[in-house]
Amino acid sequence: MSASLQQSMLEAIETELKRQVARLDQTKVISFHEMLTYHMGWTGEGAGTQATGKRIRPLMALLSFASFHSPNHDAKTDWQNAVSAAAAIELIHNFSLVHDDIQDNSELRRGRKTVWTKWGAPMAINVGDALFVIANQSVLDVSNHYPAEVVVKASSILSQACLELTKGQFLDMSYEERTNLTIE
């Protein structure tokens, strides 16, 4: 894959993430939307490429998709049909970061104040929850390009991954307090 294809994918991912987060860009909840855009690295002090992160997870998803395309399709353009699913992966990652920052009492993320240190833990939990829901809506958006059974499978895989993520976070937190750890 060429560097220009990767750059096109990253640009498409960023555009899609902004489109998905814009679901909350409404007058009554504009400050809530601002919290999400702050966490995503788009607004506020220190906003920019360092604050957004590398977007490696959605990029890997699109590169994988392009690598395993059908011979009847063009890998150079087919990946565009999967951008909303790739964005869902990044949104899930960010949901987990917001919650993890609270759970670990982390005050900084990517060189900036975390959401909970700026707006408090209750608001940060709500921001994380919103990112989780938006991610689930984002994966469903592939229904514009794929049959229902593919969409259901993609949604199921994302849900299972989230369940595994929360189990891992539970273990992480519970191990912090344990003194009798074994290899098993």
Label each region the model flagged.
Residues 20, 94, 138, 164:
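Short alpha-helical functional segments enriched in proximate histidine and acidic residues
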Residues 62-66, 133-141:
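Short glycine/serine- and small hydrophobic-enriched flexible loop segments
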Residues 22-32, 48-57, 125-126, 133, ...:
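All-alpha helical catalytic cores of prenyl diphosphate-utilizing isoprenoid enzymes
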Residues 86, 93-94, 122, 161:
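A generic hydrophobic-helix recognition signal that picks specific residues
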Residues 1-92, 98, 102-117, 172-173, ...:
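Conserved N-terminal diphosphate/IPP-binding helix and adjacent helical/loop segment
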Residues 117-137:
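Multi-pass membrane catalytic core of lipid/isoprenoid biosynthesis enzymes
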